[in-house]
């Protein structure tokens, strides 16, 4: 294995070339697509779920690095990128909305997350809020408006699990533990916009350590209507979200 300054990512400080902002999708296959929208994209490393590229915006280096699914792997990516000099993190993902008025194809910008994860507890007690940085949130909202995307801003429920933690019954056992039975209805009543699996860890880590973080997601399904997304809709929604996160990064540099 090549020399690295960190345990998992396979990167050195020299690889970052002074970058202080990272775009962090979950999916490794999304990394190259994001980097391709910027100047001078170059692949840096790929190890397990962590694929990283470097590119430039207005002459400044930006890192794009996948986190994999869920809080534990996200915490590794964020920790090691911070060790290498990253101070601002913009997460991009896809999501399932749980409010009837949110349509497939809309964009959601997260201001804070319901901490349904476990990893964030390793960084701050449950009383500490998983809150996004104001400048990051503002940049994401402005970027979304600049491309004409229908945008909703609010709270996200961030779960360690895709099935029981998001109250899905289409599973092998068909069972959801008592803690999560009826939970989606409660989150809906509180105005929570959506479910995803990484933002609670990301936002808690960053807010508690003096780092900046923001979160944007494209809606690929509304769970009040259906559970399975359409492939073409997913592709279009991802494309919009990618453009938004790159424009937001430009505004934050």
UniProtKB/Swiss-Prot annotation:
In short, the EC number is 2.4.2.3
Instruction: Name its GO BP terms in alphabetical order.
Output: nucleoside catabolic process; nucleotide catabolic process; UMP salvage
According to UniProt, this protein's pathway is: Pyrimidine metabolism; UMP biosynthesis via salvage pathway; uracil from uridine (phosphorylase route): step 1/1
Q: Which GO terms describe its cellular component?
A: cytosol
What is catalysed by this protein? uridine + phosphate = alpha-D-ribose 1-phosphate + uracil
Q: Which UniProt keywords apply?
A: Cytoplasm, Glycosyltransferase, Transferase
Broad class of the protein's primary localization: cytoplasm
Q: Which InterPro entries match?
A: Nucleoside_phosphorylase_CS, Nucleoside_phosphorylase_d, Nucleoside_phosphorylase_sf, Uridine_phosphorylase
- Give the EC class as a word: transferase
Matching SUPFAM superfamilies, A to Z? Purine and uridine phosphorylases (SSF53167)
Q: Which NCBIfam families match?
A: PRK11178.1, Uridine-psphlse
Q: Give the record's subunit note.
A: Homohexamer.
What is the name attached to this protein's record? Uridine phosphorylase
Gene name per UniProt: udp
């Amino acid at each position: 294995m090549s020399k690295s300054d960190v345990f998992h990512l396979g990167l050195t400080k020299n690889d970052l070339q002074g970058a202080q902002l990272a775009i962090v999708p979950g999916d490794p296959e999304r990394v190259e697509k994001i980097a391709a929208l910027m100047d001078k994209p170059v692949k840096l490393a790929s190890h397990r779920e962590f694929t990283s590229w470097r590119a430039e915006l207005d002459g400044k280096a930006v890192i794009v690095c996948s986190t994999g699914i869920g809080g534990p792997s996200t915490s590794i990516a964020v920790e090691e990128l911070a060790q290498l000099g990253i101070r601002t993190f913009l997460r991009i993902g896809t999501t399932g909305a749980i409010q009837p008025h949110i349509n497939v194809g809309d964009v959601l910008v997260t201001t804070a997350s319901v901490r349904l994860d476990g990893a964030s507890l390793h960084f701050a007690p449950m009383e500490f809020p998983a809150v996004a940085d104001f400048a990051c949130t503002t940049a994401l909202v402005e970027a979304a408006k600049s491309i004409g995307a229908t945008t909703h801003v609010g709270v996200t429920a961030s779960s360690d699990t895709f099935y029981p933690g998001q109250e899905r019954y289409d599973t092998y056992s068909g069972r959801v533990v008592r803690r999560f039975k009826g939970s989606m209805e409660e989150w809906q009543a509180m105005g929570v916009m959506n479910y995803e699996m990484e933002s609670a860890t990301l936002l808690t880590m960053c807010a508690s350590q003096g780092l900046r973080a923001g979160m944007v997601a494209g809606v690929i399904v509304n769970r009040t209507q259906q559970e399975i997304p359409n492939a073409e809709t997913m592709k279009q929604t991802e494309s919009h979200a990618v453009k938004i996160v790159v424009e937001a990064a430009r505004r934050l540099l």
